[in-house]
């Protein structure tokens, strides 16, 4: 899996793959265990996933990404809200992360993923995350 927002890991509800992607077809309907939280989530098929983009597997976090919200709604997944209104982790995350600022937590999550051997590559990329023009905070779909 690849992600531009590792801090949303605890809000993942499934992994989506394109049903035409031969690499992942045999995994549709199976489950994976998320690192750190050890929560099992299903692998689903959805044509939204671009086979050519990234790994071709998309972590779906409906409460914290607008495209993921659409996928989650389509497949009847309930969004898991992991941030409070101040951008701090709430009680839907492991205890050691609760009340941590989402941006500060990003570094801790990357560090923890590396410690347990679940980090393969770290690179800076440009991506779009919507910010409020008045609040200058990340806009979440929930």
How would you describe each model-predicted region?
Residues 53, 57-142:
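Residue patterns forming the tRNA-binding/recognition surfaces of aminoacyl-tRNA synthetases
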């Amino acid at each position: 899996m690849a992600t531009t927002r590792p801090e949303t890991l605890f809000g993942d509800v499934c992994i989506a793959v394109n049903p035409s992607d031969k690499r992942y077809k045999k995994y549709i309907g199976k489950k994976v265990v998320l690192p750190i939280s050890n929560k099992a989530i299903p692998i689903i098929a959805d044509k939204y996933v671009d086979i050519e983009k990234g790994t071709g597997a998309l972590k779906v976090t409906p409460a914290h990404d607008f495209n993921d919200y659409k996928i989650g709604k389509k497949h009847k997944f309930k969004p898991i809200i992991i941030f409070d209104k101040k951008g701090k982790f709430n009680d839907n995350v492991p205890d050691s992360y609760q009340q941590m600022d989402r941006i500060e937590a990003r570094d801790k999550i990357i560090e923890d993923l590396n410690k347990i051997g679940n980090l393969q590559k770290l690179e800076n990329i440009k991506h779009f995350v919507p910010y409020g023009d008045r609040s200058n905070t990340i806009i979440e779909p929930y």
